[in-house]
């Protein structure tokens, strides 16, 4: 490139819209940045820039920051000022690029911690928790006594599903503050709610909202906890009071609409979540679509669901991770064969409390089965509180071996590896004891983890005689029910109906493989039987598990599905309803209005419809 061309290139502004030249921003040569001596010369001007910003002389501060950063892209005071200005201007790409640069700069531990907290909070604000974790962890490691860093890591871990770890960091933040903080306590309360520890959550919410009654998110969380505890009138009253104070708050309005839907008031949902004046978010579209479905307006309902899925893909980057999970399934099938598993050691003797593993693609009815089992004396609902997937990730370290799961299981054949299944079982049981599931009266604890289809091989090693109950539902009803949800699923398969169908087929094929290679205590249960013939179907499940038949509650109590068992309680309990058959073969009515609705997934699902015995329902 000629000299003139190079000069033009050097003058080009950065694509991130920071206002800096790109050779001083995203395309900068870090090795050419000024050293400490040069930065010290500019430090006074950097502090003057901060002073201008603090005095609200924003134009002057911006001009000075751009000038200084053109000389020294790593001058922290000027970089922080430009970051704050671009953040206020909502220039997202620039805000992120500058935050990443700030977090990467060397400095005193407290300064590095603050910069990493800033970056983590940026990601948290966008729901990008996986990306938020490294800077949040870096902040805590740099300054472990920083309460804000502990709090932010608590948020990241909680929203990533690592609830007990999140709780520890929240409690550490409170201890470091040396006082109660309304925001931290409200976030701790939400964490406890997700753990099913509802009574504790209420106590923390009440304390948090006394300190910070202006915490809208906390008010909404408190209402959700009361709803989950069965105090629905109180929950709705709390939401009504909050909406009277903040009538334009969309989250509170959405929660109130969900309350309307739970009470069967679909018209109220449509009135509360209108199409205008604002464009609806994905969750709002789904709730409105569900209300339309209740009013027998299936075409409009599907239009809302389709719009929600489009938003998930376009705004939130939710695209099906087909290749990654196909490769994972192939690896599991290659490893988990009868020949390879036969010599591996098993845990003995039988566990004190028998886990009952529940399988079922999302919206197949496994949560309903868990709710019904939770009403039976001697059962506790383990839901997804301590998934075996966490153990599988820990195996390489526990085995003192390199390699990934499942190949690392070969180390069970070497030296002390034979004791590892028992150690893994103990860790699994200890986690459930810490959650409060191992009560003296409990003999069976359900495990409804979404990762269970992948863990059937590990289940066989840790709990050789554990019952595995697979809840099945007509595949087209499964597709339709998932279409109506704004919920991120494994592999982002929620992104579209074809993605749902492909992942359904992948998991069903994986389960079929495990059944062909392992001797599992496996019982298939149809959702349709569970909701139309509840007591006999549950009786068959209890007999298979080995629970005494006298423990089963009467049919009327089962169908009411309203008993409140001891905690912790799974999140799905908050949305439970009396057992009903509205969803049985629901796809038929939709197909009658939209014959091509399932056209894209028929080739994928028809073989499973036949194999599962649902072909007659299609006739």
Predicted segments, located by residue:
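Alpha-helical solenoid repeat scaffolds of the TPR/TPR-like class and their adjacent stem/linker regions
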Residues: 1-436
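Glycine-rich phosphate-binding loop used to anchor ATP phosphates in small-molecule kinases
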Residues: 420-458
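Conserved nucleotide-binding/hydrolysis micro-motifs of P-loop NTPases
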Residues: 386-387, 475-478, 530-531
């Amino acid at each position: 490139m000629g000299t003139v061309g190079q000069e033009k290139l050097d003058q080009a502004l950065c694509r991130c819209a920071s206002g800096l030249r790109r050779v001083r921003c995203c395309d900068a040569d870090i090795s050419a940045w000024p050293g400490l001596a040069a930065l010290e010369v500019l430090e006074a001007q950097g502090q003057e820039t901060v002073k201008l910003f603090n005095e609200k002389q924003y134009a002057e501060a911006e001009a000075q920051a751009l000038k200084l950063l053109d000389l020294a892209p790593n001058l922290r005071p000027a970089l922080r000022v430009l970051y704050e200005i671009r953040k206020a201007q909502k220039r997202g790409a620039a805000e992120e690029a500058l935050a990443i640069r700030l977090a990467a700069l060397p400095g005193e531990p407290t300064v590095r911690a603050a910069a990493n907290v800033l970056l983590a909070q940026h990601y948290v604000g966008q729901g990008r928790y996986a990306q938020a974790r490294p800077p949040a962890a870096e902040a805590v490691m740099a300054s472990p006594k920083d309460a804000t860093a502990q709090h932010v890591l608590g948020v990241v871990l909680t929203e990533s599903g690592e609830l007990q770890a999140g709780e520890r960091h929240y409690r550490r933040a409170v201890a470091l503050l040396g006082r109660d903080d309304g925001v931290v306590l409200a976030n701790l309360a939400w964490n406890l709610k997700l753990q099913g520890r509802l009574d504790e959550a209420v106590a923390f919410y009440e304390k948090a909202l006394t300190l910070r009654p202006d915490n809208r998110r906390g008010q909404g969380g408190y209402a959700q906890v009361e709803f989950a505890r069965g105090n629905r009138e109180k929950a709705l009253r709390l939401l009504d009071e909050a909406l009277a104070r903040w009538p334009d708050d969309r989250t509170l309005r959405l929660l109130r609409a969900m309350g309307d839907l739970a009470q069967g008031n679909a018209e109220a949902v449509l009135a509360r979540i209108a199409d205008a004046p604002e464009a609806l978010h994905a969750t709002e579209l789904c709730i409105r679509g569900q209300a339309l479905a209740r009013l027998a307006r299936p075409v409009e309902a599907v239009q809302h669901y389709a719009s929600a899925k489009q938003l998930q893909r376009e705004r939130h980057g939710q695209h099906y991770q087909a290749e990654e999970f196909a490769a994972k399934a192939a690896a599991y099938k290659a490893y988990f064969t009868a020949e390879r598993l036969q010599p591996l050691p098993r845990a003995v003797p039988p566990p004190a409390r028998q886990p009952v593993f529940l399988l079922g693609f999302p919206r197949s009815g496994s949560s309903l089965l868990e709710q019904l089992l939770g009403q039976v004396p001697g059962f506790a609902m383990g839901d997804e509180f301590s998934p075996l997937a966490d153990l599988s990730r820990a195996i390489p370290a526990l085995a003192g071996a390199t390699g990934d799961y499942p190949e690392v299981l070969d180390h069970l054949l070497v030296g002390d590896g034979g004791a590892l299944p028992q150690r893994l079982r103990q860790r699994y049981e200890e986690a459930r004891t810490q959650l409060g599931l191992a009560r003296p009266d409990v003999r069976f604890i359900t495990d409804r983890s979404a990762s269970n289809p992948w863990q059937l091989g590990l289940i066989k090693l840790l709990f050789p005689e554990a019952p595995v109950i697979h809840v099945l539902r007509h595949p087209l009803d499964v597709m339709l029910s998932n279409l109506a949800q704004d919920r991120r699923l494994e592999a982002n398969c929620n992104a579209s109906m074809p993605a749902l169908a492909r992942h359904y087929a992948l998991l069903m094929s994986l389960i079929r493989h495990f059944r062909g290679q392992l001797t599992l205590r496996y019982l298939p249960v149809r959702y349709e039987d569970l909701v139309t013939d509840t007591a006999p179907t549950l009786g068959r499940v209890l007999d298979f598990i080995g629970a005494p038949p006298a423990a089963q509650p009467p049919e009327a109590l089962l169908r009411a599905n309203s008993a409140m068992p001891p905690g912790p309680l799974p999140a799905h309990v908050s949305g439970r309803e009396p057992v009903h058959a509205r969803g049985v073969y629901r796809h038929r009515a939709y197909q009658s209005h939209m014959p091509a609705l399932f056209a894209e997934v028929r080739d994928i699902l028809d073989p499973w419809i036949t194999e599962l015995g649902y072909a007659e329902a299609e006739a």
